[in-house]
Amino acid sequence: MSGFKQHTGLVVPLDAANVDTDAIIPKQFLQKVSRLGFGKHLFHDWRFLDDAGERPNPEFVMNAPRYQGASILLARENFGCGSSREHAPWALADYGIKAMIAPSFADIFYGNSINNQMVPVRLTEQEVDELFQFVEANEGAQIEVDLEALKVRANGKEYDFEIDEFRRHCLLNGLDNIGLTLQHEDKIAEYEANIPSFLR
C-alpha cells in the first residue's frame, strides 16, 4: 500500500449523526470477501430509490453534481456506529474516500478505516460546524488533510487534530496488519528454521 501523507480534495457534507454501518453498506451486499466493488453500493438505501440501484435519489447529498468526485467525507458525531463489518470502510475506500472528518467515530470503525488507509480526523463540534458552513456555501470547496503536520486546512484556517502515533506511522508508511508482519520477515524465517522437526 502507498502511504498517506497529505491529501487535498473535494468535500461532500453528510449532515447526519449516528450514521451506522448498515446505512454505509446494507447487509444484502456483504456476500463478497474481496474489498473491491463495494463503492457502487455505498449508502445504497439513501443514494437510490430502487433496490437495483438504477434510480438515484436526487435529494441525497452524494448525488448532487457539485459533490461528484469527492474524496473527503464530512460528517457528524458517532460516524460508523453499529455492527463491526469491515465492508463499511471497504465501501468508502472503493468509492474514492481518502479521509473523513467528524467530531467522533465508532471505535471499531475508526480502527478499520485506518487499516484500509483512510484517515479518520476528529475535530470539535464547533470546528466541524465551521467546515460544514464553508463547504455548503462554496461550490467546489476543498479541504487539505495533512497527516504529517496533523492539521486540517480550509478557508485560510488551520485545525489541529490528534491520532495515535502508532496508527499515524502505519498510515504514513502504508502499513496494514500484513505489512507490519512482513517487516519482521527475517525474524519469522529464522524462527521457522529453528522449529524442531517434530513440531513442523
UniProtKB/Swiss-Prot annotation:
EC number: 4.2.1.33
Pfam families: Aconitase_C (PF00694)
Gene Ontology cellular-component annotations: 3-isopropylmalate dehydratase complex
GO MF terms, alphabetically ordered: 3-isopropylmalate dehydratase activity
Keywords assigned: Amino-acid biosynthesis, Branched-chain amino acid biosynthesis, Leucine biosynthesis, Lyase
Cited function: Catalyzes the isomerization between 2-isopropylmalate and 3-isopropylmalate, via the formation of 2-isopropylmaleate.
Protein name: 3-isopropylmalate dehydratase small subunit
Lineage: Bacteria, Pseudomonadati, Pseudomonadota, Gammaproteobacteria, Vibrionales
